[in-house]
């Protein structure tokens, strides 16, 4: 319950901060607020883009949540998504003549492998040298981004004249026009199935149980004989592979190409998403629609209402600042104070005679028993 309260307060305050920024930075606040809150649902194209972004947010949040469940924090999401998208664009820009499904599967496997290897380096350094995975993953991501930028601009630039993107993906590999059950975009459907598989892995498999135990209590994991070092490595590999899946779906689903800097901010958005959900897989999918709505609404406000500030950044900042606050602490202090006042009143008014003393002891024992029971429940 405390986690739910903290998450709800962080989200509400983040939305309030974004609304305040829109009012302060816009020349016409009413038009900007209307564009922010209503325009994402105004047309079918906006709704379709919202569903596509929700699928990407599910994959991103799964990557961040898998790292959190194993006791790690993967800050290299931007670089891992970027590398996977770049590899996908290179492998799918032309048809090889071996079957579309086979080529699509090879590109997917390569994208997952590249991102998983980048994350695996941080896991190995954590397991063998006890280095911080946050620092190593962030540094590797920071090193990969300018390297891929240079490759896109020089070697793999679109020969048709686009200076900031690779050649577009072959039309047969694009998921943008593909739909699945009830008209839901294919990206969101595939991402939901992946979320279901990851949730079953952590909840109903022996290896997933070991991952969760070693992530929460590594000393206990070592005591019972679990390979904690393997948890670090494979947890980061799984996190990187899911970030790579995000890059793959970004190229074949939403963008159709790999352009310079398309993954900027995705890693931190995924971390904010996972922190709000407290790494609960079942919460990630519905929460993805909220984050997709926020990003779509911010773009609509910037384009339609001439807003010069990307307010999604303020949402992420508010979440990072507020998610760690213990908002239930004041309520617990009030409960403790009320309990002390109750004990004082019982002591004052039940002091005369053996009958009153017995009644006082009984009242205090019943109150303490109820408090202990409610505390454990």
Curated annotation (Swiss-Prot):
The complex is probably composed of two ATP-binding proteins (RfuB), two transmembrane proteins (RfuC and RfuD) and a solute-binding protein (RfuA). The keyword Flavoprotein does not apply. Belongs to the binding-protein-dependent transport system permease family. Keywords: Cell inner membrane, Cell membrane, Membrane, Transmembrane, Transmembrane helix, Transport. The keyword Transport applies. It is a multi-pass membrane protein. Coiled coil: none annotated. The chain crosses the membrane at residues 4-24, 49-69, 72-92, 98-118, 135-155, 182-202, 223-245, 249-268, 274-294, 303-323. It is found in: Cell inner membrane. This is Probable riboflavin import permease protein RfuC. InterPro entries: ABC_transp_permease. GO terms for molecular function: transmembrane transporter activity. Signal peptide: none annotated. Probably part of the ABC transporter complex RfuABCD involved in riboflavin import. Probably responsible for the translocation of the substrate across the membrane. Its main location: membrane. GO terms for cellular component: plasma membrane.
